[in-house]
Amino acid sequence: MRLLTVSLIAASLLLAGCANDDASTITVSAASSLTDAFTEIGAAFEEQNPGTSIRFNFAGSSRLAEQINSGAPVDVFAAASTAAMQRAVDSGSVETPRAFATNSLAIAVPLQNPADISDLTDLADPAVTLVVCDSPVPCGAAAWELFAKNNLAIKPASLEPDVRAVLTKVVVDEADAGIVYRTDLNAVVGEVKGIQIRDEVNVINEYPITVTTDAKPDARSFVEFVTGNDGQRILQSWGFGRP
């Protein structure tokens, strides 16, 4: 199973350990929806830059911004929305970001689709156990924007800390449906059924990336790689759009 979950304990230990890394290790804090694409990008970057290692911390963008603003030793921040990135910008923790990808929402349901969901409007049924990201997280903010845009009165069964937590609940049949990013469906092919949302009623998130104000020198090279041809090719292979 390609689905990767990162516990808060693991993330805390990771960030604490980064303080002792040498200059050849770049710490990248990235939105959980970037897990698969960035893992592949990191491997490609390391292959092209012998001697440089990439260490990832994947979590909800809002939590990552809080960690960075609190002084966590991070070199690169890639968020799932401009709003989450702006929190780090406003605190002076990061340099000016640039957009590197776009993403939109989809509905994930168990393979057997027990609630017989076929459309966005089906999620308004009180009998449907729906899980979404908490609103401070970009996937949550986007979900509530989606509901408002389509005049849907939604009462989720639970609010999750990041999009991969939402996806996990669907994978293990603890929910009838979850609002995730389209790209997340590529990580669980054969484990969930994806229901696409029409573009005209969907919500598109723009993903920004930047280095922190005290980033290691090679951090800029990683950002250039992500925004360059190789990085963009990998992102598109996972379903991300160009900015």
Say what each PLM segment does.
Residues T52-I54, E95, V128, V192:
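A structural micro-motif
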Residues M1-A16:
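Sec-dependent bacterial lipoprotein signal peptides
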Residues D75-A79:
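Periplasmic-binding protein-like
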Residues G92, T96-R98:
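Central helical "cap/lid" subdomain
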Residues C18-E47, S62, E66-N69, S81-T82, ...:
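Exported/periplasmic ABC-transporter solute-binding proteins
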Residues G51, P73-V74, A175:
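Short, high-confidence coil segments that cap the C-terminus of an alpha-helix
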